[in-house]
Amino acid sequence: MDEQQLQQLTEQLSLTYFKKPFRHRAYFNSRLKTTGGRYLLNSHNIELNKKYLTEHGQKELEGIIKHELCHYHLHLEGKGYKHRDKDFRTLLKEVGAPRFCTPLEKEKKPQRKVRTYKCEACGQTFLRKRKMDTSRYVCGKCGGKIKEIIKKG
């Protein structure tokens, strides 16, 4: 789906569910990471996350568009457009728009190596994510020398 098709879909959904025209822009914003879409109060445009279309399909995207159109139409009418407002929650139910969107699959970060250090005097162990210069630090418990324990295999 390209930007023009998205614009047409948004205009069509606005007329079908709200019986009002959508006179601004709807477009994909690749910078959106954790949200399905957002309604911009100043420009009245709607930004959408394209990942929802690729991961969850057009039905999910239509739900997000309807949700953002609720914000859009209520804001232009001067009614309560925020999530906590009664006008907003009522309109969501009327048009069948979701209150929240389905979460995206999280991109898993590579797991960091955990380094283990041990005090030579008292045996206190320290787990660290970052490498530590053992010549600059001493054990906080007894003041003894610290040595890195290297696990084999």
Swiss-Prot record:
Principal location listed in the UniProt entry: cytoplasm
Keyword line: Cytoplasm, Metal-binding, Zinc
Occurrences of domain SprT-like (ranges): 6-148
Positions annotated as active site in the UniProt record: E68
A GO cellular-component term linked to this record: cytoplasm
InterPro entries tied to this protein: SprT-like_domain, SprT_Zn_ribbon, Uncharacterised_SprT-like
Binding of Zn(2+), residues: H67, H71
Cofactor remark: Binds 1 zinc ion.
Keyword Cytoplasm: yes
Protein name per the record: Protein SprT-like
Organism from which the protein derives: Bacillus licheniformis (strain ATCC 14580 / DSM 13 / JCM 2505 / CCUG 7422 / NBRC 12200 / NCIMB 9375 / NCTC 10341 / NRRL NRS-1264 / Gibson 46)
